[in-house]
Every structure is written in C-alpha cells, then in structure tokens.
Swiss-Prot record:
Cofactor binding, per record: Binds 1 Mg(2+) ion per subunit. Ca(2+) may be able to substitute.
NCBIfam families recorded: lip_kinase_YegS, PRK13054.1, YegS/Rv2252/BmrU family lipid kinase
Organism: Shigella flexneri
UniProt keywords, alphabetically: ATP-binding, Cytoplasm, Kinase, Lipid biosynthesis, Lipid metabolism, Magnesium, Metal-binding, Nucleotide-binding, Phospholipid biosynthesis, Phospholipid metabolism, Transferase
Lineage: Bacteria, Pseudomonadati, Pseudomonadota, Gammaproteobacteria, Enterobacterales
Protein name: Probable lipid kinase YegS
Amino acid sequence: MAEFPASLLILNGKSTDNLPLREAIMLLREEGMTIHVRVTWEKGDAARFVEEARKLGVATVIAGGGDGTINEVCTALIQCEGDDIPALGILPLGTANDFATSVGIPEALDKALKLAIAGNAIAIDMAQVNKQTCFINMATGGFGTRITTETPEKLKAALGGVSYIIHGLMRMDTLQPDRCEIRGENFHWQGDALVIGIGNGRQAGGGQQLCPNALINDGLLQLRIFTGDEILPALVSTLKSDEDNPNIIEGASSWFDIQAPHEITFNLDGEPLSGQNFHIEILPAALRCRLPPDCPLLR
C-alpha cells in the first residue's frame, strides 16, 4: 500500500460513540496510516487542534461533524500563516451535512475517510461576513434561517433534514418576510424577502438547493432571493418551477452588501449572526480541500 502523510481528525464531541467510525480508523491504522484523533468539547477547541496539527506536521486536518464543525476547522485553517498549511478533509457526521453532500463526499465512513486522507487537494473559496465571521457553504436569511435556528435538537436528531420542513410547516402562520436592500457588482434589489441564500456552496437546511449554480472555486458568490407577500403561496410557487418564476431573484458577485431597517438574522453554516448591515465577500482560493475527482461544485 502507498504511504500517506499523517492526518489529524477533529471530531465533534457528539460523535464519540460512533462505533463504525472507530472501526474505520482502526482499520486504516492497521494498513499503515497515521491518524491522530482529537475531540471537541467547546467552542475554540477546533482552532487549538489546528495549531496542534501544524506542530505535528500533518498533511490534512479532517473535520468530523456537520457544517458547523467544518466551518470551525476551515476558519482556523485560513487564519494559519506560513508554508505547509494542512489541507481540509471532510468526514460528514452531522444532521444535514449540506456542504459534504453537495461536493460529493461519500456517505460511507470508510470511503469518506480514505478520501479525506488521500484525495486530491484543490484550492477552494470561502466567504467572510463583516471582515470577521466566515462560511464555507452558505449564508441564509429570512424564513429558512428562523426555521433552521429554531428547530428542536431532538427533532433534528430523530428526523434529520426532514425536521426543518416539518418545523417550518408548524410555524408557517407566524413567519413574515424581511424588508431589506441588497447591492453587489451590477446588482441592486430592495423589497420583502422570504428567503435569502448567498452561496459559496449550493444547498442548506437539509438538502434545499438554494443556490443551484454555485461553484466553490470561481471567485463568486451566488445570490437567490425568494420574494412574496405571503409565505405559503410564495413557497408553493417557488416549489413548482425555477424558470421565469417572479418570486425568485438571482445574482452573482464577489461581494454583497445587505441593509435592513430592522434586525435580521443570517445563518452561516449553522451559526446565527444578527444585525442590520452585512458585507459579505468571497475569499478566493482560501484553503485546499480534498475532494472527489467528479466534484460537481468545481468549474
């Protein structure tokens, strides 16, 4: 078997009792691969483990968890300075795994782990909000954000991505559009938005394709706005067809500015960020990620 450089797996604490994962790691270790494992307990652990990975000289830091875990590891990696910054590997263990699914990471743990260690490392973009918070997948605002933020953890654990839809239907009568103004390169829109998706990746909320044209290495963010005065009629309309749909506004830009007369909340890879003013910009080729050769999000 070919020799591979060492890797460090940063595992979300919720996945420590995953027996198939433990078996997959032990099997690869028996085949000669060096895999260090660290478990997160609280916010900030991922950044500390990335620093440890640099000292160990590993070639890959593997994010084992959902979109939030991937986000924490990515954010720590892009803050590293100097040469020999480890590549990102992805092991999908979360509720929705939107980013991992959209880039084609295998669901089988052993295959995903092998890809994370031995896959080709490709430079991909990230995005940054207000010069501080980053996301690798998507920023969502409006109806979708409130649903994903408020869906109970027990419901998510039991039903996965379907839980967001069920909780959304339960809350349909209490949700209202967000009034805002959005500017970008050759783009300007203002009005009432039911859902706002600004994507480096394509899907969020457990498999919803909010930005179906997004690519992760094109230096652009894809914007999709779902409009309408009432939630249910507009939602039904958007589900029918994307072609010539008056309730869908689209744009592409390396940056977007969003202003609102009231506080709105964006969900950045699962983490909420509230405010009235947002500047979202792309960070081209911000890190290297081990991806399958047929990844659909590469140009």
